[in-house]
Structure formats: C-alpha cells, structure tokens
C-alpha cells in the first residue's frame, strides 16, 4: 500500500482533499496488528470497521454525529467511510466472494464513519476517556457487525 494508491481510492470515493488526513489515519489504524483487519474483513459474519471521529476536526470537516448520520446526506461521513472500504477491498484484497466470505452483510460495511456527538453526550468525550487531551482530535476504529433481521410473515 502506498499513499498514492490510498489517494486514488479516496478520489474514487469522492473525498474532498481536506478529508485525506482522516483517511490516512483510518488506514494506519486498521493496519495495526492488534486490530486484525484480515480477520474482520474476511469473516463470514460480515464484520466491518466503524470509524468514530472525535474533536474539532469533525466540526471543521463536517463529519456528522447527529440524526441521520449513518445515512445519505453527509458527504464527509459517506466518502471517508467509502474511501477506507475501497482501500480495504482494492489494496487489501478483501473482495466479496473471494477473500471476503460474508454470507450476508450490512450497509455499514460499505461506509461507516461518523462523529462523536459531544453536544448530546452525557459523559466525557471518547478521546478524553481514552487518555487524550480535550483539545486533541482523534479517530477511533471498532470492528462492528450489522443488524440481525428476522422476517416472519407466515
């Protein structure tokens, strides 16, 4: 993986240039050995990384943590998440049906990036809880699985 190839995936995802530092940070985070992106990206359970932006950078770039932040309408959320997903697939080889063995997956695997909603948060910000100063911006990555849906119409 090179910075140029990561930039190509960001452009394909529609990222604005100012989003790229978050994309780089996200990729460095998922490539950490202890995160185990290989296990998450290739499981049959449909797991995916979720990216939580905390601090001023979220406001500066328009990463949303308010109502509807997981859906369409927030370019930063969608394109940062999509750029990281493209890189995992295109550069890491996690192609559906090949290395990615998800039997069924979920929309969050396409793009799952959002901001911490500090204004509505009743506890200290995540970055502070993790030992960073309040004036620092951070990106936290969690391995997530999607919804479980049962439809009984009989």
Question: Which residue stretches match the model-derived regions?
Answer:
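A structural signal for small-residue-enriched, beta-sheet-centric alpha/beta enzyme cores
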Residues: 48, 54-63, 70-81, 85-154
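Amphipathic alpha-helical packing elements
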Residues: 1-40
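Short, conserved acidic/polar surface loops in the N-terminal third of protein domains
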Residues: 34-35, 62-64
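Long, hydrophobic, well-ordered secondary-structure blocks that form the structural core
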Residues: 32, 41-45, 50-53
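Short, structured secondary-structure boundary patches
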Residues: 39-42, 119-120
């Amino acid at each position: 993986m090179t910075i140029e190839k990561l930039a190509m995936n960001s452009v394909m995802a529609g990222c604005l240039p100012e989003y790229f530092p978050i994309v780089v940070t996200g990729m460095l985070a998922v490539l950490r050995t202890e995160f185990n992106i290989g296990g998450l990206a290739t499981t049959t359970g449909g797991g995916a990384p979720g990216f939580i932006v905390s601090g001023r950078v979220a406001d500066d770039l328009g990463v949303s943590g308010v109502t509807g932040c997981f859906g369409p309408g927030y370019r930063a959320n969608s394109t940062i998440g999509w750029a990281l997903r493209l890189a995992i697939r295109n550069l890491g080889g996690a192609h559906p049906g090949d290395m990615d063995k998800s039997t069924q997956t979920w929309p969050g695997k396409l793009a799952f990036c959002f901001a911490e909603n500090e204004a509505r948060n009743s506890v200290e910000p995540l970055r502070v809880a993790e030992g960073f100063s309040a004036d620092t911006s951070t990106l936290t990555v969690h391995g997530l699985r999607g919804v479980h849906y049962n439809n009984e119409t009989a």
